[in-house]
UniProtKB/Swiss-Prot annotation:
EC number(s) from the headed UniProt entry: 2.7.1.33
Functional note: Catalyzes the phosphorylation of pantothenate (Pan), the first step in CoA biosynthesis.
CC cofactor note: A monovalent cation. Ammonium or potassium.
UniProt key word ATP-binding: yes
The gene coding this protein: coaX
Disulfide bonds: none
HAMAP family assigned to the protein according to its UniProt record, in alphabetical order: Pantothen_kinase_3
Binding residues for K(+): D134
Taxonomic path: Bacteria, Bacillati, Actinomycetota, Actinomycetes, Pseudonocardiales
Residues at the catalytic site: D114 (proton acceptor)
Protein name (record): Type III pantothenate kinase
Length: 265
């Protein structure tokens, strides 16, 4: 089985894929787990958590594909893989690793591994231009050509970051649960915050996506498929007018695909 590991700033996501999909079929995600990222976690602590979640699957791993957007955990991730899965073929996505994704930006080394992997997965799923909206610590909106080229994108503060900042800077406001309010017009402080965060972010995303799609199609033609992913995507996607597909495991799929590119399938 293949273990996919996505170490992000807020969460670490694990995915377990079946060994060999049927010819022409997409890889089958058997299980997935999500846990809070601890930036000071050591390789041994990371391994203890990962192996604990995997349970009996831990000794059935035949391949590993991983990435980390947290520099302090990238080294610990490498150490963990070398120490606990010594003989298992593995790929850690970083500059120099073969992904097959052309990075048509000013400085390709600045592009995060998660954005590259999402590009690979989006192009695998759709033979059109794509825009990927990844709702994580930041909200990343990336443009991809129908040829699978990464063209760049836009960053915006993530939902939780914005909510934390608002609660810390406004004396009478506090952090609230991120759920859909009864109506857009809030009847109390909690609902007003929930409405502003949820519908405000949906509007922000739709505005950026429309501009990106217009620019993308003016230079690369159309059509364009818009994909939502990331931990907070389920909350916003249903309120978005532009996101047509919700793919929760987009990054995990990309990790599976990049493993196959480097080790064959």
């Amino acid at each position: 089985m293949l273990l996919a590991i996505d170490v992000g700033n807020t969460n670490i996501v694990l995915g377990l894929y079946a060994d060999e999909p049927a010819e022409g079929a997409d890889p089958v995600l058997v299980r997935d787990w999500r846990m809070r990222t601890e930036p000071r976690m050591t390789a041994d602590e990371l391994a203890l958590t990962v192996r604990g979640l995997l349970g009996s699957y831990a000794d059935r791993i035949t391949g590993i594909s991983a990435l980390s957007t947290v520099p302090s955990l990238l080294r610990e991730l490498r150490v963990m893989l070398g120490r606990y899965w010594t003989d298992v073929p593995r790929v850690v996505v970083e500059p120099g690793v073969r992904t097959g994704v052309p990075l048509l930006v000013d400085n390709p080394k600045e592009v995060g591994a998660d954005r590259v992997i999402n590009t690979l997965a989006a192009h695998h799923l759709h033979a059109t231009n794509c825009v990927v909206v990844d709702f994580g610590t930041s909200t990343n909106i990336d443009a991809i050509s129908a040829k699978g080229e990464f063209l760049g994108g836009a960053f915006a503060p993530g939902i939780e970051i914005s909510l934390d900042a608002l609660a810390s800077r406004a004396a009478q406001l506090r952090k609230v649960e991120l759920v859909r309010p009864r109506s857009v017009i809030g009847k109390n402080t909690v609902e007003c915050l929930q409405s502003g965060i949820l519908y405000g972010f949906a509007g922000q995303v739709d505005g950026l996506v429309r501009r990106i799609v217009a620019e993308l199609e003016s230079t690369h033609g159309g059509p364009t498929t818009v994909i939502g992913t990331g931990g907070l995507a389920p909350l916003v996607v249903t309120e978005s007018d532009t996101i047509s597909h919700h793919v929760p495991d987009l990054t995990l799929l990309g990790l599976r695909l990049v493993y196959d590119r480097n080790f064959g399938s």
